[in-house]
């Protein structure tokens, strides 16, 4: 049996205050899609609007009015996993935080345990950023000293 996503009316959508509705062209575009979609749209309707930027489509639907909270959380986990695929050796705390989120979604851990995993992942991100910045600063200083004639 196919599930049905909630639909949002044009009036409800305007309460989200889309920034592109601030100019005449953006407002015309919204009114065009209101007519095209019959005054209501669900997340899939909006995600399939190819002439709307990816950023605007995601901004529009990544909210509980369009998508159930559990799916939004799972989507966040998948985005985080995709980002970690770009890192040669991701910090285990980041990987564990994603798993903790899924455990929380299944009711296997408490909100406090999830918060602890999130804090550990945040520490990992800061550690990585600090290390990268420090390496960059060392290289910058070496290059500056070389530019100034110091071998």
Where are these regions (language model features)?
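Short, glycine-biased loop/turn motifs at secondary-structure junctions and
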Residues: 1-151
């Amino acid at each position: 049996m196919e599930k049905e996503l909630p639909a949002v009316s044009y009036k409800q959508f305007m309460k989200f205050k889309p920034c592109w509705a601030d100019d005449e062209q953006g407002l015309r575009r919204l009114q065009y899609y209101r007519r095209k979609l019959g005054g209501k749209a669900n997340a899939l309707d909006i995600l399939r609007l190819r002439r709307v930027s990816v950023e605007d489509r995601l901004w529009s639907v990544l909210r509980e009015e369009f998508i159930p909270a559990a799916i939004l959380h799972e989507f966040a986990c998948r985005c985080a996993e995709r980002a970690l695929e770009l890192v040669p050796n991701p910090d285990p705390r980041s990987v564990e935080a994603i798993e903790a989120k899924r455990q929380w979604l299944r009711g296997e851990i408490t909100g406090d345990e999830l918060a602890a995993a999130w804090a550990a992942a945040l520490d990992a991100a800061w550690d990585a950023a600090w290390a990268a910045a420090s390496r960059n600063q060392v290289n910058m200083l070496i290059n500056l000293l070389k530019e100034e004639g110091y071998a």
